[in-house]
Amino acid sequence: QYDEPSSALIKMYLAGEFGKDPEKVSPYAASTFYAVDRYASYERVWKDYYQKGGVMLCDRYTTSNAVHQGGKLQGQAQAEFFTWLYDLEYDKMGLPKPDLVLCLDMPTELAHLLREKRDTQGVGDRDIHEHAERYLARCRETARLAAKYYGWTLISCVKDGQLRSIEDIHEEIYRHIAACLED
């Protein structure tokens, strides 16, 4: 959706126009940027398809807001944020709740090495999140906490200290999706 008008505030946020440190940008404000963009996408692009029984597979959704913005908070403030976020997006905005959430879990250090490799290959630009290693480590912990709290399925991208192959991770993802569709 980055080419749509509804993503303007997201682009500004990720470019650092509200501050270069993601932790200093209100998680409530940043979450609202993403929520409004999701709402616009739902209403304009996929609502009819979904309501007719279509299956949607989303790479990042409300759950990504829970991880990236919830990672800015701790303890009771984080729990209150999760409640607020889900109320905003699912109850007030009417976005569909996911039937299945798969969270790819990778140690922050390995993710950093993969980003550096991507940088040397000239693939993509880093956003303000990708420049903040401590923030990303906290996001990983938030994802693991949220997975337990909400019943998400964690998929480890590492086995015996080594990165799993894309094909191996794909097969595990496929199994979970197939099982969900059978229900």
Where do the model's predicted regions map?
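Short loop/turn elements that form and flank the Walker-type P-loop nucleotide-binding site
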Residues: 51-52, 96-97, 148
